């Protein structure tokens, strides 16, 4: 579900759980046994390990020696539970008419008689995937090009059962900028990783679609445009490199161009899932302040961090920032508080003259007044514009925070 949410949750069919369809898988195994397209293998684990060791010593790929392929059940050892192996073709070749890679062919004698049912009675991936795809009337099987050997095996299963084969497309794997395959050890290798830092579904979908595929000079695609223009034939054969800086740029575009109402809804969900539950009063302030909070934000996490001065009741000022609060700066703050107390209307039009007068009276510049205010109100000398900060917090909270710095 998180993967679906992370890409926008546009999939409308019910989730399919392979393990719940084991009975159908086993029926197909029995059918393959009945038609002579599968057989029981009684080789022990030690025998298989010995075969693998010999192959390793000869420096050749391991292929099961098909010992039980043509043996009679009469020869079967007592009290040994067999595995079921698919009887792969030995003569000729198997071809994939791949929508991305073109025609790919392999000699059948290089495909082993692979296991389709384990000793414990559970079916293996290639059997289960073939059965499920057939039951669900899959027209296209799209997966990474590291699965080509599985496709050759599955094609033989389809042919043995006289099922109509789906179309296959093997897309290149995504690599790191260094040219290595993405792995779980990489910081951002799953959709969950991107969700946690606040990459928006539309941005991630748009970026992934453009990896190794293009349509004219167009960079930004809505969901509707993605469906309209995307085609498998346009995917390149070479691996694409995942560039986090481009993902962030794409996400920044979507943040800037999303309506504040839609963005706020996404932000609220992000906080609930990955940060904290924020009370309604503070959420309302954030919603009204989104126009400046999203400025320069590249992720939802950036917006969250920009909003911390609203979310946090206690502002922690680090030693480096505290050193900037000189006696002169504190006197400016006291004067600011006194003048703010005197105004009825609290907006930029009434605040601007106060700050301008303080600049003039103290023979300083805007930074000389704005920086100490920002530090006390947010805990940082960086952040949104000072008027945005002051107005979003409101008169009471501003005065409360300023009064805590002596």
Language-model features: locations:
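Hydrophobic alpha-helical segments in the ANL/AMP-binding
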Residues: 8, 126-128, 373
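Basic, alpha-helical terminal appendages of large translation-related enzymes
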Residues: 5, 14-16, 20-23, 27-49, ...
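Active-site cores that bind ATP or allylic diphosphates and position pyrophosphate for catalysis
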Residues: 18, 31-170, 175-182, 190, ...
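Catalytic adenosine-cofactor/nucleotide-binding cores of aminoacyl-tRNA synthetases and other
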Residues: 149, 161-316, 378-406
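Short, charged/polar micro-motifs that form catalytic or ligand-binding hotspots
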Residues: 144, 194, 359, 363
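Single conserved hydrophobic/aromatic residue that forms the stacking wall/gate
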Residues: 1-11
